[in-house]
Amino acid sequence: MNGKVRGALVWSFAERYASLIVNIASTMALARLLTPAQIGVYSVCAAFVTVATVLRDFGISEYLIQEKELTDDKLRAAYAGAIAIGWSVGLLALLARHPLAQALREPGVVNVIGILALNFAILPFASPAFALLNRHMEFRKIFIIQFSSSMVHACTGVLLAMNGFGFRSLAWASVANTGFQALLLLAMRPPGTLLLPGVKGMKQVFGYGSYFVTSRLIETFTRNAHEFIIARVFGLTSVGLFSRALGLLEMFYTNVTSAVLRVATPAFADQHRQGGDLPALYAQGTAMMTAIAWPFFGFVALMSRDIMRLLFGAQWDAAAPICTLLALAIMPTYLYSLGPNLLNATGHVAKRLRINLIYSPVHLIVLLIASRFSLEALAGSWIVSHLVALSLYVHYMRSLLGATARTLLGPSLKSAMVAAGSIAAQALAAELSHRAQLPLLIGLMLTGGAGIAGLLIAAQALRHPLAQELMRAFHHLRKRATP
């Protein structure tokens, strides 16, 4: 891992957690200023707009990041495509707001979507510049932009809510966030990138984008299909239990994985343009991800009941076995979590679409079969789908990179041993905590601490890449702290 990637990861994690602190503070304030009904109105509208946002970007940001030879004509075409699609999707959102309000029997939906649609008018001027900062791996600038706009979002929402704007305060906060972000991007964009839109090169932009957005839509549907199946077969209470269990596991994605994936695409694209060793970068990145993810999911699998009871109360105990099974089933995904980014970064979005066209039907069939037995069977069945996805990604990456499966996944064998050491330490600590009948929080802290200690000892003993990176970071910090 080179210094550019390390720096990008530091700034990406810094932005993620700085914004998280701001969001938690604003959420706590808004929860006291707005009623559940007001927040509910905004949430429904935000969900609708989120789906539209997938269409709005149309893969143009990824196109700009991965394009090997980004000429002025291609950049002009990207601006033109962003404006054409963004404004069209915004217009469709405006036209759909009245039927949606009637379907939901909530007139406030008209106002909220009308305000949120302004984002679609602004974003086409911001998203290409943001993509270019990613392309050049300017994550320090991205940190400034994202954190500053998060502050504007939080302050706007709270101030408007205090002045009686109700659910509109959240909508206007979103627009303020987008507008401020666009202004910062105008000032901090890479030099020579503020160009008039053009149509030359539009075919390449839309060719890449059509594959990308189709793949994203299939992934979005597949990722949420289980809720409809569970609701139909087991009822809404089971949907709540399953969602609570899955939501706990998604905390890792939100706070760790997403920060890595934001850096992965530009890092792979940069290596691809320079003719670098992509198999080695993928193998090292995957080894690092699995060494962190597997001990975490092992911790959740072991301690799911205690975690659920501490965070949500005894009424959610039934979600604990579901959480355990999902945690185990998710583990194989971290062997290919960087796969979609690698395919995007090298321009092979068609291969990503082919994978989804195979994986999605398999996943749905597996869920439907498992739903004939129990909710726990459905949760455990996810491992079948994930192993199918793993085999597909390895197959396509082998042919694309000219590398063997051992080259791509070999370093992750050490991660399995690191995870085994960490989970063994956790299991021992958990058993001792339960025998001593320690309070839940103390038991979880001891078990988590034992897991971290086991991870560090095993990683150092096995000379895992994670240990090398941690030692490098430690020496760097000590050097900076020394006068």
Regions found by a protein language model. Give the residues of each.
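Interhelical loop/hinge segments that connect adjacent transmembrane helices in multipass membrane
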Residues: 1, 5, 140, 183-228, ...
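N-terminal membrane topogenesis motif
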Residues: 1-24, 57, 62-65, 69-80, ...
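Membrane-interface junctions at transmembrane-helix termini in multi-pass inner-membrane proteins
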Residues: 2-6, 63-72, 122-146, 163, ...
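Signature of the first transmembrane helix
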Residues: 3-58, 81, 85-99, 114-119, ...
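Transmembrane helical elements of multi-pass membrane transporters/channels
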Residues: 8-23, 170-173, 177, 181, ...
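Helix-loop junctions and terminal segments of transmembrane helices
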Residues: 53-72, 134-135, 193, 245, ...
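Hydrophobic alpha-helical transmembrane segments
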Residues: 110-117, 145-191, 204, 208, ...
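Membrane-proximal transmembrane or re-entrant/amphipathic helices at the cytosolic face
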Residues: 395-399, 403-405, 412, 424-483
